[in-house]
Amino acid sequence: MKINFQNMCSLRKISCGLIFSMAISLVACDSDNDEEGGDNGDDGLVEDTSIPGNSIVTVKQNRNIILHNPLSGWVLYAGIGDGLSSTFWQDYDNFPSSEGTVKVSDYANTLYLRGAWADFNPEEGKYAWNSDCDTPSAKRLKMLIEGAKQRNMKLAFTFVVDSRDKHYNFTPNFVKEADAKGYETQTGSVKVWSPYPDDPIFQKYYEKFIRALAKDFNDPDKVQFVSGSGFGKWGEYHSVWYYQVRELGKPELPTREAVFDWVTDLYSQVFDKVPVFVNYHRWIGTSKEWDGNNYDKDTERLIGKAVAKGYSLRHDAFGMKTYYSTWERNFIAKWKYLVPVVMEGGWVKNSHGNSIQGDGYANYAEVRQGEFDEAKTACVNMMDLRYNSDFHNGEAYSWFNEAFQLVKQFCTEGSYRLFPDRISLPTTISNGKQIEIAHRWNNFGWGYCPTNIPQWKNKYKVAFALLDTKNDKPKYVFVDGEPEACDWVKGTAKSYMFTTRVEGVGAGKYMWAVGIVDTTKQNEIGIHLAVKNNVTSAGWLKLFEVTAR
């Protein structure tokens, strides 16, 4: 397959609709009534009077198809502690819903593993994902990783170090035994130990663990994202206690900022191919658990520092009106379409029970609707299906049985849903001659495709292919270096003119096709389009036949 990467070609970006102006009646492809993809092909071609030798093909979106694209869709939760069901995959492959049994991986394309650092790193230099580690947690991890692979799901991680509210130490015992400074708290009848994150011994071992993790998991083929902190209660980066502050009485901000800088530097440096996320809430890194409508004045600045290093944003209390309120809404509105957002609901049916009534919810169907509405306002790319060992009282069960329509609605309206509604291409091409391709792109999801994050820089690009008419495989690929999918947001179409030279193309008939390719993988399709008809098994959208001379 010959590749023509056209970064330096003569390109001109022009305003939406100009290149497609014509005195004919066409279907409005940005209508909200469009459903199934139309038949793209010679019968639907219209001569392009503005580009001699070109014809225009129109494409309809498909609103019903579930797309499993990078950093999009539902996230299925799991852990590797003792509470994990021994029949996890069997349970989720035969999952009860309000409409019958479903396979959850048909809806979710990410498996999120949130757990104790101690479970992933039980001994110094020994890691649960390696073959030489055979602890019960390691066996569960390997089972989950293999099951995710079989279901074409990618992984995501959060590693919690704080043992407060836990029934065992979440930081490995060898860290404590190395004289790292920490503190003890009581969880029921159990006394647990947590490290101070400003302690240099803790930092040495934690950094060693994260670097070992990145060695095997800084791989976008395996991993969807990593949460790049895990400090404080529940790993959400609030209620953080520091040695310099709690034991020595020093001001909090200098220590807090030094720890924040250290950990965000660490993750952003070692995970340069996989997106990393930091929580956004009004008390990032402070010792406060909460304080009503008050907020910390340095939080927004610190989160901004993380974003500047390549971090994206997540929040873990969507739908909780105390913890996701005016400050959080105003904050995330400033980052709309600038960084991707991942959501997690806050209410836990099994433990919170009727406490939801304090937020005005009558039942958990209303909770799910509240989470969904906040997620839509925040333009999130990913939503959560949390795990609970009490299966029928878990959040995943609640979504599929009390709000299944919202599960499906997010699949077809949330994240990003990209497609080109009109493309103008030449009907004949000749070697040594320039061609012009005009194309217009839309996004009908409420999120965005974050090609602007550094981990994805120049990774996903629009490409046009000449397919072999016998097997639909690309023979020649032309990559347009100009369009950025991050610019495509709902309600605004973007138009481009791509000029390139044809070289080395064998004479004969081919099929024009379009797709969004992964340039790091020899221009294989990297993002699937929101279309259905005339799509090859590899993901190319076939357009019409072209003759090469």
Please report, for each region that a protein language model flagged, where it lies by residue.
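Active-site groove signature of glycoside hydrolases
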Residues: 182-202, 206-247
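Bacterial Sec-dependent N-terminal signal peptides
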Residues: 2-3, 22-55
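Catalytic cores of secreted or luminal carbohydrate-active enzymes
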Residues: 368-425
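Extracellular/luminal regions of secreted and cell-surface proteins that mediate adhesion/ECM remodeling
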Residues: 412-549
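Aromatic- and acidic-residue-enriched segments that line the glycan-binding/catalytic groove
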Residues: 164-188, 238-250, 292-299
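N-terminal secretory signal peptides that target proteins for export/translocation
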Residues: 1-11
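Catalytic-core regions of glycoside hydrolase
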Residues: 48-95, 149, 228-235, 241-392
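Aromatic-lined substrate-binding rim segments of carbohydrate-active enzymes
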Residues: 100-185, 256-275
